[in-house]
Regions:
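Amphipathic alpha-helical interface elements
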Residues: 1-69, 80-91, 95-108, 137-163
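Short secondary-structure subsegments characteristic of cysteine-rich extracellular domains
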Residues: 110-125
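Individual transmembrane alpha-helices with interfacial aromatic-anchor signatures
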Residues: 125-137
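Conserved active-site-adjacent core of cysteine acyl-enzyme catalytic domains
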Residues: 72
Length: 163
């Protein structure tokens, strides 16, 4: 595989991860709303017509809960077999959102680093250091797909494949 093909595959896989994370959060919010009849009605009637500058009711769809809070609330409301392991999902999301991805010179793969806040001695601890290999992408895509399948089951949505 050429360097260009490897880079293009990296970009495609990164897009899959980001898209899956967004879908997972949105799906979890939809499950929470679905279980609250009042909120479900508001979401179905208000949000399709909402415009910038409008105000809407506060609910799981419109609140500012972060991914961790949203998934914890989802787990409290969803059936046991639909619950998600929150920690690896949030860890991945935080690494992609707040980490540093780079590659230079002879490096075969891009590298993802996430740093903590500086310590009293002025140094910065490394929280995460991963080579973004094909296996790393595949493991994370599989993990998110399993979580998405659980959310889909909790929503009782039909899975459709693109043709």
């Amino acid at each position: 595989m050429s360097e260009r093909e490897l880079f293009e595959l990296h970009v495609l896989n990164l897009g899959k991860l980001v898209g899956d994370l967004q879908s997972l959060e949105m799906g979890a919010r939809m499950v929470i709303v679905k279980l609250d009849q009042r909120a479900a009605k508001q979401v179905q009637t208000q949000l399709p017509q909402v415009k910038a500058g409008d105000s809407v009711e506060l609910n799981a769809f419109t609140n500012d809960d972060d991914l961790d809070q949203t998934l914890e609330k989802y787990n409290k409301r969803s059936p046991l077999d639909c619950r998600i392991d929150v920690v690896p999902v949030v860890r991945l999301r935080d690494a992609l959102a707040h980490g540093r991805t780079f590659g230079f010179g002879p490096m075969k793969y891009l590298r993802l680093l996430k740093f903590s806040r500086k310590t009293k001695d002025g140094r910065v601890p490394v929280e995460l250091a991963e080579d973004m290999t094909a296996e790393w992408f595949n493991e994370n895509i599989r993990m998110l797909n399993k979580a998405l399948e659980k959310v889909r089951k909790a929503l009782d949505y039909e899975k459709r494949d693109f043709v």
